């Protein structure tokens, strides 16, 4: 038996022993701190079953202290969230398959069926939850359990509303920043392009039932592009700004104060023509923009927020040991907590590997995503997404 198999068997054994303790003893005989410690060691789906035990234990499991403690324990096991999106044209929907990936194991989490989008959709993963946006319909999913909550329809005359999910650790609160979009035709460098400009800006705090949508006092239209990244309670995203919308800027939304502003311009040497090949991400605790190079390497612009004038530091890394044809199919999805770059394919295949590159040691490692079972998505072109820092959460149970 390998070391990883031994650890997995011991984990299953410990979980089974914890469950037997709860079954054999009356809860009145189990000290509260002992019961909570047992819950902490269980998989999230097992914890969910105990919600039906009593109102008292449901309140304990849904308490802020238990939720945050459960996630802290889960974060001690570094994993990725792998998503395969299967387009089902017959039923006019999408099936999202969630898996967690450790250094040695691929584990199936859940499946969620989403309505087929009439407009471009965006997904953002933050602190255990993932947001989906379809036109004006928004909902949040817990990949650990497959449970979702549908948000109220965005109140706007626009047809498309782009959203970014963020988490405020100080107030333990998730919020959606929603940009209501309108199209604008623009001539640029002799070409005509269609931009999606924000016309209204709203915020949706999760868990607020009465009048959840709130308008934000920010009236400057801008055209958001790329993904977003949430760092220490602040959301960042890139957008076209300025009167002629030719300037690329980094936008900032403080989740605590709910203030949206233009934070800084992108670096002067930033190759805007290849914008959609970039990933906005966290790099060693800082905001960064990263892309692959033609010569099997990575370039990353890191924002220095400590300087009097916010500046960007460019770093270049040459990767050895990866074949060019394989490197071309990879996309930078983020970094691990230790600073490794994560690269993954955009579509499922039977040899789906996630590549990790450590810029400090210039070393590579890879992990294969082993998908066992007769899933339909394995037999056709299926979109793939990989998110760093996957944690189990008991939210939305």
UniProtKB/Swiss-Prot annotation:
Keywords: Nucleus, Ubl conjugation pathway. InterPro entries: F-box-assoc_dom_typ3 (IPR013187), F-box-assoc_interact_dom (IPR017451), F-box-like_dom_sf (IPR036047), F-box_dom (IPR001810). One of its GO terms (cellular component) is nucleus. This is F-box protein At4g11590. Part of a SCF (ASK-cullin-F-box) protein ligase complex. Interacts with ASK16. The lineage of its organism: Eukaryota, Viridiplantae, Streptophyta, Embryophyta, Tracheophyta. It comes from the Eukaryota. PANTHER family: BNAA05G37150D PROTEIN-RELATED, F-BOX PROTEIN CPR30-LIKE. It comes from Arabidopsis thaliana. The F-box is necessary for the interaction with ASK proteins. GO terms for biological process: protein ubiquitination. Residues 24-70 form the F-box domain. Pathway: Protein modification; protein ubiquitination. Pfam families: F-box, FBA_3. Component of SCF(ASK-cullin-F-box) E3 ubiquitin ligase complexes, which may mediate the ubiquitination and subsequent proteasomal degradation of target proteins. It is found in: Nucleus.
